[in-house]
């Protein structure tokens, strides 16, 4: 990950005054880093601390249940990196993925479906398999041991009604 600093635009910091006025941008032209000296002490401590969402005691009925994956900060960060890769790096490189969907699309689907941890494991496993000696073809993201085809609720599995081995092969 790289940090890009533009030399064409000056830094902008937010000045917080004690008179409770709205925040006003203040341009600092000669500073090379962000400073928080002008902020009150309690605001400095708030900036240093990370806040976490607390789980409500009464869950909202509209909120996702256990089976549904809510996009976390990690998923959003991973998807942002993948979008950057697809937009900036991938067009420069020759096509080399042997699978459908491509490795970057596979990774995006895995992160959306399984979350950060399982998505990272599946992406790593896919990148290890995507080489000239590996396989090729259709390979959707699915967790280990998970079946590839999910039946709808109303459908039943097809029964084998063949009498002979020869009829099965046809």
UniProtKB/Swiss-Prot annotation:
Lineage, broadest ranks: Eukaryota, Viridiplantae, Streptophyta, Embryophyta, Tracheophyta
A UniProt-annotated Pfam family: YidD
Family that this chain belongs to: Belongs to the UPF0161 family.
Domain of life according to the entry: Eukaryota
HAMAP family, per the entry: UPF0161_YidD (MF_00386)
Start-end of Acidic residues biased regions: 154-170
Record region (Disordered): 49-70, 147-170
Protein name listed in UniProt: UPF0161 protein At3g09310
